[in-house]
């Protein structure tokens, strides 16, 4: 997959989505992925910051961008029911970006992952 992206005639990226571990992010980076997502949304804020910062520092050292998640999106993909979803506080998001230097954020704003009935 990485080789196909590198040989494409148009710009292409290879992205690791929703990794919950530093080790898996590092494996993807070693394989040549252009971007990774570290999903520490299941962790307390401070632990999510520490994990994300560790991934960002390693990834940025080799030119790889990083997405992180803050809050809990409802839906099939994350295994969260609507009742357990947690909307991201904008002040927490700003602080998180400042502390981690992450490139992109997945935030919970009342949206959901996965399938919608009737769509």
Descriptions of predicted regions:
Residues 1-11, 18-119:
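Alpha/beta enzyme core
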């Amino acid at each position: 997959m990485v080789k196909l992206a590198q040989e494409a005639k148009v710009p292409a990226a290879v992205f690791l989505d929703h990794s919950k571990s530093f080790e898996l992010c590092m494996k993807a980076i070693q394989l040549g992925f252009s971007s990774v997502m570290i999903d520490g949304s299941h962790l307390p804020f401070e632990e999510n910051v520490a994990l994300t910062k560790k991934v960002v520092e390693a990834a940025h050292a080799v030119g790889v961008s990083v997405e992180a998640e803050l809050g809990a999106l409802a839906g099939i993909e994350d295994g969260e029911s609507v009742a357990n979803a947690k909307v991201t506080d904008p002040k927490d998001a700003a602080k998180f970006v400042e502390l981690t230097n992450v490139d992109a954020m997945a935030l919970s704003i009342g949206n959901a992952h996965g399938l919608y009935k009737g769509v």
